[in-house]
């Protein structure tokens, strides 16, 4: 509504066909009885990223970022993040949002205080931009990859790079994963990444942020893209577990995290056809912190699935490729899906869901930043951050 009013004030204030919109009042609406048995109560707050240019307010509001920072800093057990982008750096002059810094501080605190603490991050395997990696038309795609890797694992301003200075094994606390699927198309085995477009964070199975905001400056700083989210604080609780101990989890946050993990691990009823007659995996999802789930289930399944896809399709991005020359050599070899499709399908039937590892070492030795002579190199870096 504020966007419409801004447009109306600037562009069409004298056109009577576009009247001011007034907020509706819903005080008199009765919730149908059937819905009352299907829903839970919760405290919900609307969050925004807006400023003068987007909503004609006299200040910059970054309540979305502030909610992220507060929930991360005050988390006790577990953070689950799914997002389309992850561009956030520590002590950077080019990226200003502080999500990465607060994540790093929270993991450091867990290390110093000997806490069992987990962070799950799910991102698309590749950004949703035109072109192919290593091709002339793929500069925009590579630019986003460049900033993603600088944020996660490469260089002194990255999350994992900072953690390695103090924490012997940062991956004890973090799992960065993605999603991939396969099918038979026109009699041929094919694969494609599942593009994660979700923007949510679930903290301690009690707090949830859902909305339109990506993890980057464009969405978080308030003075750029306008965004809206909600933060949900559960007020109804159910018995669950954290690190093997009894725990009161929020009904909504727990059910959302469980459903997302069920989907990624192939546990939903509609995913049974993928199993080739095997029973659906029976995995206890209540405790996301305990070692047996974090390492032996989530991490092990992601690793096994990644290995199968690499063997069957020679997919990329992959940690097996650290330079553009290695990428060409990797792609030049015939995949199992072509020289032995029957064996390949047998291998694919051993997959568990769609979870795969995010390849943090992909093109590690290559420069993914756009060339200065390219159109991507001529625009401000803020376009990609």
Regions found by a protein language model. Give the residues of each.
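Charged, low-complexity intrinsically disordered terminal segments
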Residues: 1-385
């Amino acid at each position: 509504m504020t966007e419409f009013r801004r447009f109306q004030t600037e562009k069409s204030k004298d056109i009577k066909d576009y009247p001011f919109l007034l907020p509706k009042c819903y005080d008199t609406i009765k919730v149908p009885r059937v819905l009352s048995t299907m829903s839970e109560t919760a405290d919900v707050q609307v969050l925004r990223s807006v400023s003068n240019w987007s909503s004609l307010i006299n200040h910059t509001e970054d309540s979305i970022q502030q909610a992220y920072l507060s929930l991360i800093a005050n988390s006790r057990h577990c953070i689950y993040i799914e997002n389309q982008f992850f561009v956030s750096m520590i002590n950077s002059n080019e990226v200003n949002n502080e999500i990465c810094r607060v994540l790093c501080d929270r993991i450091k605190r867990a290390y110093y205080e000997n806490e069992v603490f987990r962070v799950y991050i799910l991102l698309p395997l590749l950004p949703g931009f035109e072109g192919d990696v290593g091709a002339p038309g793929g500069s925009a795609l590579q630019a986003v990859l460049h900033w993603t890797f600088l944020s996660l694992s490469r260089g002194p301003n990255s999350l994992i790079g900072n953690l390695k200075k103090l924490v012997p094994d940062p991956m004890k606390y973090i799992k960065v994963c993605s999603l991939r699927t396969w099918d038979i198309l026109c009699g041929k085995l094919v694969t494609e990444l599942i593009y994660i477009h979700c923007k949510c964070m679930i903290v301690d199975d009690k707090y949830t942020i859902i909305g339109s905001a990506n993890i980057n400056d464009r969405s978080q700083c308030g003075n750029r893209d306008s965004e809206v989210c909600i933060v949900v604080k559960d007020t109804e609780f159910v018995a669950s577990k954290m690190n093997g101990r009894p725990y009161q989890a929020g009904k909504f946050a727990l059910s959302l995290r469980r459903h997302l993990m069920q989907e990624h691990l192939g546990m939903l009823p509609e995913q049974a056809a993928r199993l080739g007659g095997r029973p659906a995996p029976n995995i206890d999802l209540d405790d996301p912190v305990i070692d047996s789930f974090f390492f032996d289930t989530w991490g092990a399944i992601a690793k096994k699935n990644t290995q199968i896809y690499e063997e069957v399709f020679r997919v990329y991005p992959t940690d097996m490729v650290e330079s553009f020359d290695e990428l060409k050599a990797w792609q030049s070899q015939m995949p199992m899906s072509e020289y032995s499709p029957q064996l390949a399908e047998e291998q694919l039937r051993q997959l568990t869901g769609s979870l795969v590892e995010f390849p943090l070492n992909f093109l590690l030795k290559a420069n993914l930043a756009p060339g200065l002579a390219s159109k991507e190199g001529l625009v401000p870096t803020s376009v990609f951050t």
